[in-house]
Structures are given as C-alpha cells and as structure tokens.
Amino acid sequence: MAASMARGVSARVLLRAAGGSWGPRAGHAAVTSRTFGTTGERRAGEEAADSPELPRDVVNVVFVDRSGKRIPVRGKVGDNVLYLAQRHGVDLEGACEASLACSTCHVYVSEAHLDLLPPPEEREDDMLDMAPLLQENSRLGCQIVLTPELEGVEFALPKITRNFYVDGHIPKPH
C-alpha cells in the first residue's frame, strides 16, 4: 500500500479497491478529510518584515543606489541587510539567497560604521574576492545583521556587480 501511495494513487481508490468506503460503517467513525495550513514564506536568515514596535528596536539605514540616489529606510535590530534592501525596493540582487555562494549583494559600508561590524568570516572574504570594484569597506549585505550601534549606517551599492540576471530584469526575492 505504501508503494501505491508513493506512486500517487489516492487513498480513496485504495479504499474502494479493498471494498471500503468513505462513509461510516456500523460501529466505525466516518473518515474525515484534513486540511493543511502553511506558514508565510521566509528564506534562511530572513527576519519578519513587520515594522519595529519599540523605538529601541529601530535602526535608521540609508541605501545609496547606483545612480547616487539616497534611500532612507527604517530597519529593526536583527534585520538582514540584503532582505531589508529588497523589502524596500533597493536593487540589491542576492542571487544565492544569502547562502554565501555569490557576491551580488556586495555593498560599501560607511567608514564611520565599518569597525562596528564583526570582521568578515573566511567564506565571506572568499566571495568578496570575486566582487568587482572591491574596496576596503566592501561587505556582503547578506552577512550584515543590524544592531543598535549601526544607527545611521549607509550602504552604497557599487556601480556594477557580477550579476546573474538578464539586463533590464528587476530582481525580486524568491
């Protein structure tokens, strides 16, 4: 029976083949169907997108896009910078979805805040080595988690990235 179920044969067909039915039999309870619920989609490392509830949880961040436009956003303590940018329409790709397998979320961290971040781990450094236009203040947005000390931080996007999407395509979170 398990092999049949694995091949996609429904329980109803199996019950009928065995002489059973979905209706109640004398001395037996009726078979009821079950419904399944799902939780909202969330990628690894992504925090809930709701606004910070307490002022102490707010971290004001400014993204500077490739054209130089400043985009101020309100993040919250614990937010991942890549997902924060994507929620606010900032063109930060994140092709590998924060799995440290690309460098498309490469950002420049404001000098005043760079030393407030923990040093990059070896895997992040390895990915940054593949990023074009690397600078001393380069980091991967997927590896930066907001803390209260990062209040007022600026993340500038480099003029180019080694992207994995077709020109003109606007990246969207998966």
Swiss-Prot record:
- Return the Pfam families for the record: Fer2
Q: Per its UniProt record, what InterPro entries does this chain match?
A: 2Fe-2S_ferredoxin-like_sf, 2Fe-2S_ferredoxin-type, Adrenodoxin-like, Adrenodoxin_Fe-S_BS, Beta-grasp_dom_sf
Q: Which cofactors? A: [2Fe-2S] cluster
> What's the chief localization of this chain?
mitochondrion
Check the record and name the Gene3D superfamilies matching this protein: 3.10.20.30
Report keywords, A-Z: 2Fe-2S, Electron transport, Iron, Iron-sulfur, Metal-binding, Mitochondrion, Transit peptide, Transport
User: Which part of the chain is the 2Fe-2S ferredoxin-type domain?
Assistant: 59-161
Region annotation Disordered: where it falls in the sequence: 26-52
Q: What's the record's note on cofactor binding?
A: Binds 1 [2Fe-2S] cluster.
- One GO process term, biological-process aspect: ubiquinone biosynthetic process
- The record lists [2Fe-2S] cluster as bound by C96, C102, C105, C142
Q: Does the keyword Ribosomal protein apply?
A: no
What does the record give as the function of this protein? Electron donor, of the core iron-sulfur cluster (ISC) assembly complex, that acts to reduce the persulfide into sulfide during [2Fe-2S] clusters assembly on the scaffolding protein ISCU. The core iron-sulfur cluster (ISC) assembly complex is involved in the de novo synthesis of a [2Fe-2S] cluster, the first step of the mitochondrial iron-sulfur protein biogenesis. This process is initiated by the cysteine desulfurase complex (NFS1:LYRM4:NDUFAB1) that produces persulfide which is delivered on the scaffold protein ISCU in a FXN-dependent manner.
The annotated subunit structure for this chain is: Component of the mitochondrial core iron-sulfur cluster (ISC) complex composed of NFS1, LYRM4, NDUFAB1, ISCU, FXN, and FDX2; this complex is a heterohexamer containing two copies of each monomer. Form a heterodimer complex with NFS1. Interacts (in both their reduced and oxidized states) with the cysteine desulfurase (NFS1:LYRM4) complex; this interaction stimulates cysteine desulfurase activity, and serves as a reductant for Fe-S cluster assembly.
Task: Give the UniProt family note.
Answer: Belongs to the adrenodoxin/putidaredoxin family.
Q: What is this protein called?
A: Ferredoxin-2, mitochondrial
The source organism is Mus musculus (Mouse)
UniProt gene name? Fdx2
